[in-house]
Amino acid sequence: MSFDIAKYPTLALVDSTQELRLLPKESLPKLCDELRRYLLDSVSRSSGHFASGLGTVELTVALHYVYNTPFDQLIWDVGHQAYPHKILTGRRDKIGTIRQKGGLHPFPWRGESEYDVLSVGHSSTSISAGIGIAVTAEKEGKNRRTVCVIGDGAITAGMAFEAMNHAGDIRPDMLVVLNDNEMSISENVGALNNHLAQLLSGKLYSSLREGGKKVFSGVPPIKELLKRTEEHIKGMVVPGTLFEELGFNYIGPVDGHDVLGLITTLKNMRDLKGPQFLHIMTKKGRGYEPAEKDPITFHAVPKFDPSSGCLPKSSGGLPSYSKIFGDWLCETAAKDNKLMAITPAMREGSGMVEFSRKFPDRYFDVAIAEQHAVTFAAGLAIGGYKPIVAIYSTFLQRAYDQVLHDVAIQKLPVLFAIDRAGIVGADGQTHQGAFDLSYLRCIPEMVIMTPSDENECRQMLYTGYHYNDGPSAVRYPRGNAVGVELTPLEKLPIGKGIVKRRGEKLAILNFGTLMPDAAKVAESLNATLVDMRFVKPLDEALILEMAASHEALVTVEENAIMGGAGSGVNEVLMAHRKPVPVLNIGLPDFFIPQGTQEEMRAELGLDAAGMEAKIKAWLA
């Protein structure tokens, strides 16, 4: 969309933070209003993360107004809330391309702008990186400030507290801003509390505070009395005791939608030494009533008509794999009261809404705490229950040691329902489910299943749930199923594939939901087609049979080729000294950028046309 100068006259003056800082303070509320409207107009036309950005407009303006970015380093955690940041940092006219192939990256991305200090997408990384950046600035003698913005969800993760604990120990000069949008502006975020925040962050208070410490440092009883008095005064009006105990100077909570008040507080805090913590209260979806009322639904949106106040309904076609999982979960839980389901803050995305309502006492949302989720599941299994960890492929990476140490070594029957496996689409490099087969396949005695359709997905979930000799995993993609008939649940024989089509000379060994495209290729080339089903244990007998009866083999998977299912086939053939040629088709050795799933599969040669072209070129 072309930028409408008449509609956004103040925003038109700002194409960089240098231009922003030239504006008079009095014009900033108007700028915030225009920025919010522009965000609504652009995202509703292009799709993208929505409600979070609406809630951080004033904070973004205030930070770039007070701090000398990009010299001063501003780090956004996760990045859902960073659309206003992108608009104010030279990318205003491209915001309509966000999350699209070749367009702006969905999250802050170092390769895109000097203003994007840290490439993000996963949560709770900002404070750790910020400490490192602050330490380097201090060692180089640069008067460079470091600011980390983290949300109330991301700060619950253990990594954030590990970082704050370290910051309290080494005391770098840095500011952590907690964007708390868990609730609307509460009563204590009023004039009195804002005034108190400005007072506590001011130079007079800070000077008196530090001076008093020096004067009474040699008189321990008085020093301790003063410390307790200060904590008591703060504690009467602010909830910052935890952060103070971690070594931060806590200020807040303050109104995160008062841009002028934020500027005053940030200016006061800018020159304070040591780790500082500013707690702001915002409303997710601010300025667009439907998003304020339902921020979860409006967290990430497709293209929609803002005047309608609602998002377009799905066409009511085929169910998603997430729904297939959710339906199976409810069906199984109704028959077995030992079933326990765990998710790390992905209830909606993982298809667990209905389960959470029907079985609230067996549903555990552990927040953004993947490590805890896995070891919590281990504890449930030790106690005789049947835990299922529903998790995205990209987030299971964050709990790898727990899978190994707390589940697999102890042979605990934990089922991992791995959603968003393979190419996920618009979220790009940080969210592709490209590696789960590779990092799970090397774990001893792990059972790993790759369904080719929704019925097989259900059967594999059932099989994994009833497997009691150790952990198991079923991986399935983002998107809709293929429309096959759902048959009664039954356990599959572990480690056994099935031949779907008999052909000549060439055998295609397929792992997972690329099966429809692999079937087209097999038909075109008169090749044998095998649904391998199990990545671990592999059906070695079937692989050797295919090697003995065909001139060449092709493996197909939507996982990194390196270390993936195809690598396992290669290992079997080498171990048995079978010299048959093998072509491994899968994800290449680079991080896959954003684009629709269809666009990226076509570009990577993972659709039928691409596979056939690769095979023909290899055979030529």
Swiss-Prot record:
Its cofactor is Mg(2+); thiamine diphosphate. Its EC number is 2.2.1.7. The keyword Acyltransferase does not apply. Pathway: Metabolic intermediate biosynthesis; 1-deoxy-D-xylulose 5-phosphate biosynthesis; 1-deoxy-D-xylulose 5-phosphate from D-glyceraldehyde 3-phosphate and pyruvate: step 1/1. Signal peptide: none annotated. Keywords: Isoprene biosynthesis, Magnesium, Metal-binding, Thiamine biosynthesis, Thiamine pyrophosphate, Transferase. It holds the Pfam family Transket_pyr. One of its GO terms (cellular component) is cytosol. It catalyses: D-glyceraldehyde 3-phosphate + pyruvate + H(+) = 1-deoxy-D-xylulose 5-phosphate + CO2. Thiamine diphosphate binds at H80, G121, H122, S123, G153, A154, N181, Y288, E370. GO terms for molecular function: 1-deoxy-D-xylulose-5-phosphate synthase activity; magnesium ion binding; thiamine pyrophosphate binding. Catalyzes the acyloin condensation reaction between C atoms 2 and 3 of pyruvate and glyceraldehyde 3-phosphate to yield 1-deoxy-D-xylulose-5-phosphate (DXP). Homodimer. PANTHER family: 1-D-DEOXYXYLULOSE 5-PHOSPHATE SYNTHASE-RELATED, 1-DEOXY-D-XYLULOSE-5-PHOSPHATE SYNTHASE, CHLOROPLASTIC. This is 1-deoxy-D-xylulose-5-phosphate synthase. It comes from Shigella sonnei (strain Ss046).
